[in-house]
């Protein structure tokens, strides 16, 4: 009986994935592409691109922000999906 109970607890923890936090690339300008662990409850990563006088700019991070017209936005829901 104890073995069955332990098995059920382990299966529950694995299936619910307690404590999983999303990992997104964060590229904010000239720093380069690194990763960040998103806050609990945040379920999306984003990549936004726009063109300015110096060329195409790319910004990445956690969340899915609102953008101005002319900015291309891609949001996704898996680790490192915004690369």
UniProtKB/Swiss-Prot annotation:
Q: Which cysteines are joined by disulfide bonds?
A: 24-45, 38-62, 64-75, 76-81
Q: Name one GO molecular function term.
A: ion channel regulator activity
SUPFAM superfamilies under this entry? Answer: Snake toxin-like
| Entry-linked Pfam families | Toxin_cobra-type
Q: In which tissues is it expressed?
A: Expressed by the venom gland.
Q: What's the name of the protein?
A: Three-finger toxin MALT0058C
Cellular component terms, GO, for this chain's entry? extracellular region
Whether Cytoplasm counts among this entry's keywords is no
Leader sequence segment: 1-21
UniProt KW keywords: Acetylcholine receptor inhibiting toxin, Disulfide bond, Ion channel impairing toxin, Neurotoxin, Postsynaptic neurotoxin, Secreted, Signal, Toxin
Q: Where in the cell is it found?
A: Secreted
Biological role stated in the UniProt entry: Binds to muscle nicotinic acetylcholine receptor (nAChR) and inhibits acetylcholine from binding to the receptor, thereby impairing neuromuscular transmission.
Q: Which InterPro entries match?
A: Snake_3FTx, Snake_toxin-like_sf, Snake_toxin_con_site, Toxin_cobra-type
